[in-house]
Amino acid sequence: SDPLVDCKKCRERFRGDKLIEDAGGDPVGKTLAEISAMMQSLRIKCPSCGASDFTEARAFNLMFRTFQGVVEESSTAIYLRPETAQGIFTNFKNVVNSLHPKMPFGIAQIGKSFRNEITPGNFTFRTREFEQMEIEFFVEPGTELEWHDYWCKKSREWFESLGLAGDKLRFREHAAEALSHYSNKTTDVEYLCPFGWGELEGIASRTDFDLKRHQEFSGEDLTWFDQEKNTRYIPYVVEPSFGADRTVLTFLINAYAEEDLGEGKSRTVLRLHPRIAPVKAAILPLKKNEPRIVEKARARSEERRVGKECRSR
């Protein structure tokens, strides 16, 4: 859940923690009462009307609720998934029995998720329906922090290999008091967008919480038998979780540039990294009506063509 506050003057609703962040405060790990107190001490103003009169912060359920069938009652209530992770955990035993993987191993998935965001915005960065990419990486208990650091390193290498680097990319580790109840270490990968720091990926060590809960309520044995050590245990999980839509938007933001051509003229340029650019290079003859030049351009293009990445015109 997120901390919801209402402006008493204009009735607009906001996330209290985001208002505090925008004002330079740190709401991480704060209770609802502490969120309310921080908003008062920082004298936060409503982004819509400028008033500084908000309701007390209260928890807001992010899950979309609906009903199966024609009768709306508690027994038919269902929810749209807020993440793809749980579908992976429910299929853990199927994957193990079918593929017989060796520890450590991962299961990856990309798909739609739905969250009833209080304040969607910043184009596709924060929406109520979005695409998620998640990996549940199963490891031996006691090695999860080592694997957490491994995935942080791999994530940094991946983002930097596609052009996101420098002081606009940061890896922010959660303080102990700000960790989710299931996690013993979490790191957020954030990028400095025009609207502030935004999370692109969360890398969480989820311990064995999820598999334990699914085992408890399903009655299925979700333990793993290590033949080499002759031991049985419930695997721990390290989860790299990406927002696909916001990551694509961030690549576009990072590539966007406006060049000053002088004399009051400018042009907009999209400097995409070569690895994600749809066109790597183009050979363009200056004169289409001179066969010699056109033929030479085509010959050069054929020499450098790799698949369909280089196009001649």
Identify the function of each model-found stretch.
Residues 1-313:
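NTP/phosphate- and nucleic-acid-binding module
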